Amino acid sequence: MARGSAAAAIAGVVWVLLLLVGVASGARLPGGSGGNRGREPRGGAAAAAVATETAVFALGSFWRSEAAFGCLPGVIRTSVGYAGGSKARPEYRNLGDHAECVKVEYDPRLIQYKKLLEVFWASHDPREVFGQGPDVGNQYRSIIFTNGSVEARLAGLSKEKEQAKDRRSVITTQIQPIGAFYPAEPEHQKFELKRKPFLLQLIGNLPEEELLTSTLAAKLNAYAAELCSPNTQNRINSKIDEIAKKGWPILRDI
């Protein structure tokens, strides 16, 4: 009996030591969440919580529009949807009077609203009427949606500046307060990225909800459309080549 009690006591001490080591190392323990807690999510490094601001623009097909903003430093996430109309619950095949839009969430410490306006003007032809390029229809009209008087003033000034570049034709861009924004269907989110299955594999084939919120996915969506700056495009090319040589680990940042 004494020998059995001693053995039981030793086993108990060993179990306690193993338990302490497991907790210290973050290992998964029976019945607990253990090592998953605090683990960096797929699709990009975990970012500290920041107070983001949101801008919404309509500048033609939202497939391309989303990519135009995704690679900008300070842009946290992008998504596409419908706004500017009166129809409740619009859908891609039944938009009503809405326009295709891109919603840009950004860190104002790293990028200013003025810069987003510059990209907006540079990414489409605001003098076209009833569409953009091959995309014809009211849903492709040019709109700056504003949130408050400061954005409205900046948008107005930027429009005047754009108009002054050429007085022979009129800027058709509307400026209006943002109302309801209806997210588009999942198949339209990160459209350019989804056309490159190779890139999706590099970030672990994220589920739709993670693609929607991932900063890395927003950047790769722009990269897939070749809308990052030349330096950024080259840097991502090098990063992808490096990953391929290492045996296809998950891409976590660029």
Curated annotation (Swiss-Prot):
Entries under InterPro entries matching the protein: Met_Sox_Rdtase_MsrA_dom, Met_Sox_Rdtase_MsrA_sf, MsrA_MetSO_reductase
Region forming the signal peptide: 1-26
Top enzyme class: oxidoreductase
Family annotation (SUPFAM superfamilies): Peptide methionine sulfoxide reductase
Catalysed reactions, semicolon-separated: L-methionyl-[protein] + [thioredoxin]-disulfide + H2O = L-methionyl-(S)-S-oxide-[protein] + [thioredoxin]-dithiol; [thioredoxin]-disulfide + L-methionine + H2O = L-methionine (S)-S-oxide + [thioredoxin]-dithiol
Keyword hit for Calcium: no
Name this protein carries in UniProt: Peptide methionine sulfoxide reductase A5
Organism of provenance: Oryza sativa subsp. japonica
Annotated gene: MSRA5
